[in-house]
């Protein structure tokens, strides 16, 4: 099958960037279809670390085409800065190998202001956003007042769009005794970047359909993870877009038949606030944090850490129609005597084999665990199944049994080549 969708099965930070980079060697095109520069994908090539926020992970391969779809909230200044920082490292990003949908809604300073303002107003009930303006940008898109990339080409249209945008944002700012924004300030902000960003503007949906007819191999690269999905995640502690596989169609404009691959860590992490049934607020969590170097790529915040939650991952598999799994960061568990997997929940005298939608229940769930002996052997950098300890493989097989789909790849380090194939795609 020519098309592959890659999605995260937890709360993000599963290692999707490395897997997209690895699989893109045999692809032609990689498409980002949701989120914004609140996502962070880290790729290590020959000990050089690349941290990507908006750009698809295939941008590091010179012969691949990278596309930012209409489902992405676009911070134009951040994109140009990311392109320029890659050029310093010898990576050439140009309008031949990068295309941006003309329908992308633009993130502006008013969006970042609003997000920070409302996070501050929430006090102890903060969501824990990255303050990148993603949520308010999506709000404006749904409210039909967003400024889109295509609007930058027409002065009259742009002026009308800015008027509509500011009538809303300034009404809120006045109500909260916050300084209003002048139209000239927004126009200047846009004009500073428009010439550079318009070089990449394309009718992405049409180009993707042409590519599909030509038989090109396309990878759709998801950001965040299933339980940050606005509909299916741990609401309200979620992101502002759909992160499950079906969003790849809406966020790119391409209807496709595709293999859907999920990426999951061998344990669980989460950045920010919200329910986390298998979280370990103890020495185990501290060890996972320190060994796994669990700091957010974008926020640089400490990630909360816990045991693998098979209930969550199985639910994510079903939500996205995942047919196979990539399991990452198994090497982080090398030193543990005992390893646990969450296999169910208890609440109010009732057993759950799924994550209930209610936040009031989610935050009180008590995990049910199954224990496994650790392998106490270094696996970092291994590239062959024969090199893997028997107890590690028992752990992998149990996860397969619990989530109901096969694990076909294992990642044993951040490096591009440290991947073990268990099954063919």
Curated annotation (Swiss-Prot):
Ranges annotated as spanning the membrane: none
Residues given in the record as substrate binding sites: 297-303
Binding site for GTP: 12-18, 40-42, 303, 329-331, 411-413
GO molecular function terms attached to this record: adenylosuccinate synthase activity; GTP binding; magnesium ion binding
Keywords, comma-separated and alphabetical: Cytoplasm, GTP-binding, Ligase, Magnesium, Metal-binding, Nucleotide-binding, Purine biosynthesis
UniProt xrefs under Pfam families: Adenylsucc_synt
Record note on cofactor: Binds 1 Mg(2+) ion per subunit.
Binding site for IMP: 13-16, 38-41, 130, 144, 224, 239, 301
Pathway the protein acts in: Purine metabolism; AMP biosynthesis via de novo pathway; AMP from IMP: step 1/2
Group of enzyme by EC: ligase
Family: Belongs to the adenylosuccinate synthetase family.
Subunit structure as annotated in this protein's UniProt entry: Homodimer.
Protein name: Adenylosuccinate synthetase
């Amino acid at each position: 099958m020519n098309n592959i969708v890659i999605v995260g099965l937890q709360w993000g930070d599963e290692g999707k960037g490395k897997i997209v980079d690895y699989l893109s060697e045999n692809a032609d095109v990689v498409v980002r279809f949701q989120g914004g520069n609140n996502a962070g994908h880290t790729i290590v090539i020959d000990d050089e670390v690349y941290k990507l926020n908006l750009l698809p992970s295939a941008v590091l391969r010179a012969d691949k085409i990278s596309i930012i779809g209409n489902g992405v909230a676009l911070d134009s200044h951040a994109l140009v800065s990311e392109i320029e920082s890659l050029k310093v490292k010898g990576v050439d990003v140009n309008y031949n190998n990068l295309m941006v949908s003309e329908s992308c809604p633009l993130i502006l300073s008013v969006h970042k202001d609003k997000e920070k303002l409302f996070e501050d107003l929430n006090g102890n009930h903060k969501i824990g956003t990255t303050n990148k303006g993603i949520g308010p940008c999506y709000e404006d898109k749904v409210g039909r007042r967003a400024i889109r990339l295509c609007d930058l080409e027409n002065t009259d249209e742009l002026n009308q769009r800015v008027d509509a945008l500011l009538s809303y944002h300034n009404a809120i700012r006045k109500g909260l005794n916050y300084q209003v924004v002048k139209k000239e300030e927004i126009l200047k902000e846009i004009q500073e970047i428009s010439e550079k960003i318009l070089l990449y503007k394309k009718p992405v949906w049409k180009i993707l359909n042409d590519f599909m007819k030509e038989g090109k191999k396309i990878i759709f690269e998801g950001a965040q993870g299933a339980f940050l999905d606005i509909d299916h995640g741990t609401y309200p502690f979620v992101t502002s877009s759909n992160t499950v596989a079906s969003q790849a169609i809406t966020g790119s404009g391409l209807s496709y038949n595709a293999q859907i691959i999920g990426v999951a860590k061998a344990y669980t992490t989460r950045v920010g606030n919200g329910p986390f049934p298998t979280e370990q607020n103890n020495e185990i969590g501290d060890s996972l944090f320190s060994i796994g170097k669990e700091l957010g790529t974008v926020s640089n915040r400490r990630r909360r850490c816990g045991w693998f939650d098979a209930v969550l991952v199985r639910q994510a598999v079903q939500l996205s129609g995942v047919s196979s799994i990539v399991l990452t960061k198994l090497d982080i568990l090398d030193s543990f005597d005992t390893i646990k997997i969450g296999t169910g929940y208890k609440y109010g005298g009732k057993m759950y084999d799924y994550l209930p939608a209610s936040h009031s229940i989610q935050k009180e769930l008590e995990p049910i665990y199954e224990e496994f002996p650790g392998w106490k052997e270094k696996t970092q950098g291994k590239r062959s199944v024969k090199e893997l300890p028997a107890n590690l493989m028992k752990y992998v097989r149990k996860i397969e049994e619990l989530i109901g789909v096969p694990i076909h790849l294992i990642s044993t380090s951040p490096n591009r080549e440290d991947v073990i194939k268990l099954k063919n795609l």
